[in-house]
């Protein structure tokens, strides 16, 4: 009889331990609306590095966009972003071309990385604050890092060597991290200039099926927030836009710096080609003006709007203007 009681007691202990472990796992896997952030974290962040958005004041009573509502909606949107949406946010249209498909994968991974940084790591508030301060210290650093990282990925693609393949993967991971940091910076603080592509995106994004699917997939409360209006600093003014518009436009703008990375490589090739062909009155490559290559590439790719240059047809001796994200 005592042996039977002993077996029952041991069985009960095992069951209790199993239930405790299972409950602990569930608690670890469960993610609140704000993830590892708290409302206090948001208030502290906004106090240290003021965000570029606020409630518009034109939403219905009781439906104003608080910091908590915005971040919860952002978390849901990032979690719901699929490959199709990532591709659209990369090039502004659905593209089956291999190059755009690869960029779409980088964007999808970067969106996931940004969500991890903001809502899933233990010290998410500190991670966000570090990114915001980095952007404040040097407004161009985050954008230039994306451009350089993408250029590095481009030059390493197509390698068959195992060691070089591992190096390529490392460069892709750096690109994903750089993009994720730029997303966070533009969502919360950075103010990039709006070019024609951005304005066109803002006018047409609602018509895209991937965006429609995203909104349809949100719960009622977060869809309501996504379609509420906020005031966002754009250039030297504040512009009224929907929350979802701000979130998606910021990703689209950040992705544009991958294009700049591509142009940078093409531009270098153009300079070499001009010199090799005896162009520029026989100048050496080192003597070819920056604006000569830039004008050629801008014409080929239609990317004049990405550059903060109002005199593309001016003298070739004019200094090349710096580009980057304004704060």
UniProtKB/Swiss-Prot annotation:
Sequence segments annotated as region (Disordered): 149-170
Location in the cell: Membrane
Domain of life: Eukaryota
Biased composition (Acidic residues): 157-167
Coiled-coil positions: 162-227
Record-level GO cellular component terms: membrane
Bilayer topology term: Single-pass membrane protein
Transmembrane spans: 12-32
Keyword annotations from UniProtKB, A to Z: Coiled coil, Membrane, Transmembrane, Transmembrane helix
Protein name: Uncharacterized membrane protein ECU05_0140
Organism this protein belongs to: Encephalitozoon cuniculi (strain GB-M1) (Microsporidian parasite)
């Amino acid at each position: 009889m005592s042996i039977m009681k002993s077996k029952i007691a041991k069985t009960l202990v095992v069951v209790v331990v199993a239930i405790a472990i299972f409950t602990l796992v569930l608690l670890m896997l469960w993610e609140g609306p704000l993830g590892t952030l708290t409302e206090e974290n948001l208030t502290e962040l906004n106090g240290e590095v003021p965000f570029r958005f606020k409630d518009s004041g034109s939403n219905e009573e009781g439906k104003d966009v608080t910091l908590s509502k915005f971040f919860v909606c952002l978390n849901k949107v990032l979690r719901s972003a699929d490959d199709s949406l990532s591709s659209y946010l990369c090039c502004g249209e659905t593209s089956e071309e291999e190059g755009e498909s690869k960029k779409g994968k980088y964007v999808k991974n970067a969106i996931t990385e940004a969500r991890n940084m903001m809502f899933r790591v233990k010290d998410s508030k500190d991670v966000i604050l570090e990114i915001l301060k980095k952007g404040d210290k040097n407004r161009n650093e985050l954008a230039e890092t994306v451009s350089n990282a993408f250029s590095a990925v481009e030059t390493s693609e197509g390698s068959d060597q195992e060691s070089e393949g591992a190096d390529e993967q490392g460069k892709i991971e750096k690109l994903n991290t750089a993009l994720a940091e730029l997303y966070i910076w533009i969502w919360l603080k950075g103010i990039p200039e709006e070019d024609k592509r951005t304005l066109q995106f803002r006018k047409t994004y609602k018509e895209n099926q991937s965006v429609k699917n995203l909104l349809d997939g949100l719960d009622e409360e977060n869809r309501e927030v996504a379609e509420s209006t906020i005031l966002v600093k754009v250039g030297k003014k504040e512009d009224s836009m929907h929350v979802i518009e701000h979130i998606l436009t910021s990703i689209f703008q950040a992705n544009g710096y991958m294009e700049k990375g591509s142009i940078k490589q093409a531009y270098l090739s153009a300079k070499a080609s001009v010199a090799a062909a005896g162009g520029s009155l026989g100048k050496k490559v080192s003597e070819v003006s920056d604006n000569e290559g830039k004008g050629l590439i801008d014409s080929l790719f239609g990317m004049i709007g990405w550059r903060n240059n109002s005199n593309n047809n001016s003298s070739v001796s004019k200094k090349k203007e710096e580009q980057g994200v304004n704060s």
